[in-house]
Amino acid sequence: MATINLSLLPKTLTPNSKTLAPLLSILSTSSLSFLPCTRPHPIKSRSAAYPTVRALTDGEYSSRRNNNNNNSGEERETIMLPGCDYNHWLIVMEFPKDPAPTREQMIDTYLNTLATVLGSMEEAKKNMYAFSTTTYTGFQCTVTEETSEKFKGLPGVLWVLPDSYIDVKNKDYGGDKYVNGEIIPCQYPTYQPKQSRSSKYKSKAYVRQRDGPPAEQRRPKQEATPESST
């Protein structure tokens, strides 16, 4: 995955309280202190089904650290999203496109990457709680903020992001669930349009018109005979 959709608001962001212009100027530089971002969507966006907000904070920035680089003297706000506890992390990875890996190969890569950081495959299977090979290419794991730094620089690792809820009500981080080696596919909601009441009534009216009136109403009236008229 070479590109990332950064269409949503930041997950953990310390924006200027007066204007967003400094943020835009920072994003245009090559050296970034923080980046607003969302789960990458190289194939399709899931933001339509799950309105969520995410952001990237690198190893030099977090909401819990003092902002020593703020030379403006202006007070800055901290925005924390539900589920963002710096113990749940999203590791976004990129894969070659030609040939593209299979789903199984991508899952193996996720586990091997996590095992490299945690020291064993057993620990990797215990700490990976979700992943995706479609809406984004990456996995989610429970590690400390300090341990999350170890992912940086590993082969294929593109982003290391604090994870946050996609479904706040159910405290769901999204993705296909991974529980001790068992994969539970994510059930994405589907849109089913409701049938219009007016169209239903129109359909019934059409049937009545097509069938016509009852037989006794269709009988022609008998013409009056000369005898009856006299």
UniProtKB/Swiss-Prot annotation:
Residues 208-224 have a biased composition (Basic and acidic residues). Residues 1-55 form a transit peptide. One of its GO terms (biological process) is cytidine to uridine editing. This is DAG protein, chloroplastic. The gene is DAG. Expression detected in the dark, but enhanced by light. Acts very early in chloroplast development, being required for expression of RNA polymerase beta subunit gene, and hence indirectly for subsequent expression of CAB and RBCS genes. Residues 189-230 are annotated as: Disordered. The lineage of its organism: Eukaryota, Viridiplantae, Streptophyta, Embryophyta, Tracheophyta. Disulfide bonds: none annotated. Signal peptide: none annotated. It comes from the Eukaryota. Keywords: Chloroplast, Plastid, Transit peptide. Expressed in leaves, flowers including petals, and to a low level in roots. InterPro entries: MORF/ORRM1/DAG-like (IPR039206), MORF/ORRM1/DAG-like_MORF (IPR054059), S8pro/Inhibitor_I9_sf (IPR037045).
